[in-house]
C-alpha cells in the first residue's frame, strides 16, 4: 500500500503515520540497505551512513524522501516534523519499525528528553512551519480545547471574541466596592455578540 504525502514541505507538521506503507517483505526486496539500517537502529547500532540511507524529506535523499515511504511507519521519526519526536510522538517512539537516527539514539541513551512531555497518541493531520501554534499543538496533542485555542490564534475576530468573554468573566468575578461579590448574571450571549458589531 502506497502512502500519499499531503505535503512535501520540509518541517511541516506531518500526519499520524497510520498508513503502514509497503510491507516489510516488500521493503526487504526493494530496499535491502534501508531495511538493514532499520534493523541496526532496533539495537542502537545505527551509523551516520544509515542516517543517509534512510534520509528524510528535508534531506531530499534516502528512503524517507520517496513518496512511497515518506508517510509510512518506517519514516515516522525522521519525517514527523514534531519536536522531540523520539520522546513525545508515539508513532515514532512506540513503533519498532520506525528508523531512529543516531541523534535520536543519543538523546534517548543520554536521557535528554525534557521532563513533563505528553506522549502524543492522537495527532491529526495539520500543517505548520514551527511557529508558536505548532509548538502548542505538539506538546498538547491536539486535544479539543487546545485545537480551539490554536485556531483562535490564527483568526483575529475569534481572538477578539475570546478576549471580550474573558474580560466579562473577570469583571463579574471581581468583588464590588462594598466587599460583596457582584451577583448580577452575565449578559445573554446575544447581547455580547450584538455589541461586537459596534467595533
From Swiss-Prot:
Keywords on record: Activation of host autophagy by virus, Disulfide bond, Host membrane, Host-virus interaction, Late protein, Membrane, Transmembrane, Transmembrane helix, Virion
Induction summary: Expressed in the late phase of the viral replicative cycle.
Assembly, per entry: Interacts with host PYCR2; this interaction results in autophagy activation.
Localization per record: Virion membrane; Host membrane
This protein's name: Inner membrane protein E199L
Record's GO cellular component terms: host cell membrane; membrane; virion membrane
Presence of the UniProt keyword Coiled coil in the record: no
Topology in the lipid bilayer: Single-pass membrane protein
PTM comment: Contains intramolecular disulfide bonds.
Organism: African swine fever virus (strain Badajoz 1971 Vero-adapted) (Ba71V)
TM segment ranges: 150-170
Function: Essential for viral fusion with host endosomal membrane and core release. Not required for virus morphogenesis and egress. Induces complete autophagy through the interaction with and down-regulation of host PYCR2.
Taxonomic lineage from the root: Viruses, Varidnaviria, Bamfordvirae, Nucleocytoviricota, Pokkesviricetes
Chain segments annotated as coiled-coil in the UniProt record: none
One GO term (biological process): symbiont-mediated activation of host autophagy
